[in-house]
Swiss-Prot record:
Species of the source: Saccharomyces cerevisiae (strain ATCC 204508 / S288c) (Baker's yeast)
Note: Partially overlaps NBP1.
Organism domain of life: Eukaryota
KW Membrane (keyword) present: yes
Species lineage: Eukaryota, Fungi, Dikarya, Ascomycota, Saccharomycotina
Keyword terms of this UniProt record: Membrane, Transmembrane, Transmembrane helix
Keyword Membrane: yes
Sequence intervals crossing the membrane: 21-43, 48-70
A Gene Ontology cellular-component term: membrane
Cell location: Membrane
Topology term for the membrane: Multi-pass membrane protein
Record's protein name: Putative uncharacterized membrane protein YLR458W
Length: 126
């Protein structure tokens, strides 16, 4: 074998090896990319399933808290004037105006909003 043929074969084999390395790297990167994409999809599905599991676990606790708030609201609104303890005795408004649009006492929020619609109307009118 002549030295020129050897050099040509060596260059060809090196270029073939380099080409095969490039092709192999592309293949590995694609496999790695697909693998990472699958990992990302499965992790997001796992997180959403975990969140739903946590939500299903916390749902009864939220229901219990809501029922307790409802019972407390019914207890407060069943008394004669549950809002009188929040107001000075001279500032208690008379129940003269009762509109369903502005009556916040029908909402189960008397713990959060501890004043009646009449009290709001008196302060708005002043």
């Amino acid at each position: 074998m002549s030295p020129q043929t050897f050099c040509i074969l060596l260059i060809f084999s090196l270029s073939l090896e380099k080409t095969s390395l490039i092709v192999w790297n592309i293949f590995v990167n694609l496999r790695l990319g697909v693998f990472l994409l699958l990992v990302r999809i499965f992790s997001s599905v796992f997180l959403s399933v975990t969140f739903l599991g946590l939500f299903r676990t916390l749902l009864p606790v939220g229901r219990i808290c809501f029922l307790l708030l409802l019972k407390a609201d019914r207890f407060l609104t069943s008394s004669r004037d549950p809002y009188s303890r929040f107001l000075p005795s001279s500032r208690i408004p008379k129940k003269s105006f009762h509109s369903p649009c502005t009556d916040f006492s029908i909402l189960p929020m008397s713990i959060i909003v501890p004043f009646s619609s009449e009290y709001l109307l008196v302060h708005v009118q002043q």
